[in-house]
């Protein structure tokens, strides 16, 4: 390959990959705490699986980087106008090189995931295929693109928990669902925020298809569903009362985001409030064991 390592790291958006990798390890840590000392503690009594957690980090880093690289491959025309400094439109990486590089990362990440266990491998394989489909088709498909991002982001935590097999998967499934709902709602709000730019680029997003008002109602519905379901981890004895107290802060943030969207018609502020609320939700997940 003609480009240097730094250029390929830029193509991967390595900063985002690092954050995704750490988020997956947090999923492993939360599942470990729940399975060993939480209200639903199981027969698992082993030490924290540091090696598998390291593999989890690498898998998510590689697969996330592959998704970003192949996304740039399919966005060559748009990036040549909006982001000409990116590796492909700037000519520092050839388009075919970026495509082959992404396939290499997908393969390496998936194989490494199967070395952890079959559940991790299947999740990595499915997510890799979904990332390819998203970059090629779903990104420009109203709602399906938003749902894909919601699932993919939330599944990072689920993947980390899958180190412990099916038991780990079941343990964090509700948390994954809550995260996916919140992220999907925010993605729709971001599309409302970006309507003017998307219209100029002739993009096909949900707000442009059905209107900002209807898209806003859908985002609110999904966000409210996340709020209504947020006590479930405590009700199901997955997490303790500390989670319930802390998640109330997140719920207040989500409600504030809804007010900003519906009452004040400020999608930019709403998107920021969603982001803050999700941060408090993550703290609640970690501290609630």
UniProtKB/Swiss-Prot annotation:
GO terms for biological process: glycerophospholipid biosynthetic process. Keywords: Cell membrane, Lipid biosynthesis, Lipid metabolism, Magnesium, Membrane, Phospholipid biosynthesis, Phospholipid metabolism, Transferase, Transmembrane, Transmembrane helix. It is found in: Cell membrane. Its EC number is 2.5.1.42. The chain crosses the membrane at residues 18-38, 44-64, 106-126, 141-161, 163-183, 218-238, 243-263, 269-289. It is a multi-pass membrane protein. Its cofactor is Mg(2+). One of its GO terms (cellular component) is plasma membrane. GO terms for molecular function: geranylgeranylglycerol-phosphate geranylgeranyltransferase activity; magnesium ion binding. Its main location: membrane. It catalyses: sn-3-O-(geranylgeranyl)glycerol 1-phosphate + (2E,6E,10E)-geranylgeranyl diphosphate = 2,3-bis-O-(geranylgeranyl)-sn-glycerol 1-phosphate + diphosphate. It comes from the Archaea. The keyword Transferase applies. Pathway: Membrane lipid metabolism; glycerophospholipid metabolism. HAMAP family: DGGGP_synth. Belongs to the UbiA prenyltransferase family. DGGGP synthase subfamily. Prenyltransferase that catalyzes the transfer of the geranylgeranyl moiety of geranylgeranyl diphosphate (GGPP) to the C2 hydroxyl of (S)-3-O-geranylgeranylglyceryl phosphate (GGGP). This reaction is the second ether-bond-formation step in the biosynthesis of archaeal membrane lipids. This is Digeranylgeranylglyceryl phosphate synthase. It comes from Methanosarcina acetivorans (strain ATCC 35395 / DSM 2834 / JCM 12185 / C2A).
């Amino acid at each position: 390959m003609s480009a240097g390592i730094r250029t390929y790291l830029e193509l991967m958006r390595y900063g985002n990959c690092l954050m995704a990798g750490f988020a997956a390890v947090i999923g492993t840590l939360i599942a470990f705490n729940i399975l060993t000392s939480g209200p639903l503690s199981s027969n698992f009594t082993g030490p924290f699986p540091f090696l598998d957690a390291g593999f989890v980090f690498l898998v998510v880093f590689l697969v996330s980087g592959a998704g970003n690289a192949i996304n740039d491959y399919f966005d060559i025309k748009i990036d040549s106008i909006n982001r000409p400094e990116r590796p492909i439109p700037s000519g520092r990486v050839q388009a075919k090189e970026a495509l082959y590089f992404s396939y290499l990362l997908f393969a390496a990440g998936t194989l490494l995931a199967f070395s952890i266990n079959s559940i991790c491998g299947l999740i990595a394989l499915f997510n890799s295929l979904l990332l390819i489909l998203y970059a090629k088709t779903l990104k420009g498909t109203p709602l399906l693109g938003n749902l894909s991002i919601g699932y993919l982001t939330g599944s990072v935590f689920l993947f980390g928990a899958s180190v412990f097999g099916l038991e780990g998967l079941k343990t964090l499934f509700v948390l994954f669902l809550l995260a996916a709902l919140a992220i999907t709602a925010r993605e729709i709000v971001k599309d409302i925020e970006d309507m003017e730019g998307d219209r100029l680029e002739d993009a096909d997003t949900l707000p442009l298809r059905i209107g900002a008002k209807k898209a806003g109602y859908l985002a609110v519905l999904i966000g409210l569903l996340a709020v209504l379901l947020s006590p479930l981890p405590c009700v199901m004895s997955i997490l303790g009362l500390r989670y319930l107290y802390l998640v109330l802060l997140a719920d207040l943030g989500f409600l504030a985001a809804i007010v900003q969207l519906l009452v004040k018609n400020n999608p930019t502020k709403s998107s920021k409030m969603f982001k803050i609320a999700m941060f408090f939700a993550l703290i609640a997940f970690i501290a609630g064991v």
